[in-house]
Amino acid sequence: MKLVLIRHGQSEWNKLNLFTGWHDVDLSEEGVVEAMTAGKRIKEAGLEFDVAFTSVLTRAIKTLNYVLEESDQMWVPVNKSWRLNERHYGALQGLNKQETAEKYGADQVQKWRRSYDTLPPLLEENDERQAKNDRRYQLLDTHAIPSGENLKVTLERVIPYWMDTIAPEIKEGRRVVIAAHGNSLRALVKFLEGISDDEIMELEIPTGVPLVYELNDDLKPVNKYYLDK
């Protein structure tokens, strides 16, 4: 069984080196090219899908659309869930990463970005950036909407969705592609591979490059590789 993961192509805020999180930004021109290239590589590799999953953020949705279009699979059903969203960067969202490092220190910012269990500064309740003000989240329990997340909290929302919704599809023999985000995919990879809390800090997933897992019957990886050529 194969599972394909794709981090969205470069976004406009990736290009500007800004913390993005749940803020909804579009793909950059380079990001569009990355997504289209990913779809072409998937087609060349002969990978076919029966069902697709993505977040409710534009950059991941568009990446998936380009991938399916370029691989001639636009008909594949797509499921969108906030549980596959990027990690919520709290009050850091919209800030420049370099300027934030200069203000708070590179070590502190590195902990906010990469530590498994260090939370970023949280959004204030009345902050206009709160996701509860966004129509796509208005049907959610307000207690489920974060004001900021670390990777641990991100994993705690991603893995139940994997277990309850995605994994059963794979066990039924359906071929799955997931287009999501750097940290929601890091959370899933941590779970699949059993990566330690310390080791996950070093894991980087490149934008727009398909990551293919070969899984056994227990959905444990027996092989993985990037379609980067």
From Swiss-Prot:
InterPro entries per the UniProt record, alphabetical: His_Pase_superF_clade-1, His_PPase_superfam, PG/BPGM_mutase_AS, Phosphogly_mut1
Family: Belongs to the phosphoglycerate mutase family. BPG-dependent PGAM subfamily.
Function, as annotated: Catalyzes the interconversion of 2-phosphoglycerate and 3-phosphoglycerate.
One of the GO BP terms on file: glycolytic process
Active site: residue positions: H8, E86
Reactions accelerated catalytically: (2R)-2-phosphoglycerate = (2R)-3-phosphoglycerate
Domain of life: Bacteria
Pathway as given in its UniProt record: Carbohydrate degradation; glycolysis; pyruvate from D-glyceraldehyde 3-phosphate: step 3/5
Site (Transition state stabilizer): H181
Entry keywords, A to Z: Gluconeogenesis, Glycolysis, Isomerase
Designated gene of the protein: gpmA
CDD domains the UniProt entry points to: HP_PGM_like (cd07067)
Keyword Isomerase belongs to the record: yes
Protein name as catalogued: 2,3-bisphosphoglycerate-dependent phosphoglycerate mutase
